[in-house]
């Protein structure tokens, strides 16, 4: 069952509405960040969980530079759809 765009949640890395639920380890197809619950208050912390040694702050910087949470994810990402903005 697909969740409608209206009920989707914003990715903490790229900001697009691509996640079915917050903090549910959803993988964003736009930036390839896996939502582990990290937020602005701890964005510079490295949690060493599903995102490895990558902090949310680093992932955001990479996304701004290259369009993915890390350059190694570039083959997997896609552009955001208008409905995800």
What is each residue range found by the language model?
Residues 9-10, 16-18, 81-85:
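Metal-centered catalytic cores of metalloenzymes
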Residues 12-21, 44-51:
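Short, charged low-complexity linear motifs
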């Amino acid at each position: 069952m697909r969740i409608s765009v209206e009920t989707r949640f914003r990715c903490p890395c790229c900001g697009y509405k691509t996640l079915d639920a917050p903090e549910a380890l959803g993988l964003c197809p736009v930036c390839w960040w896996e939502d582990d619950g990290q937020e602005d208050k701890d964005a510079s912390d490295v949690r060493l969980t599903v995102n490895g040694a990558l902090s949310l702050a680093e992932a955001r910087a990479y996304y701004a530079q290259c369009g993915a949470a890390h350059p190694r994810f570039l083959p997997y990402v896609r552009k955001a759809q208008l409905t995800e903005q």
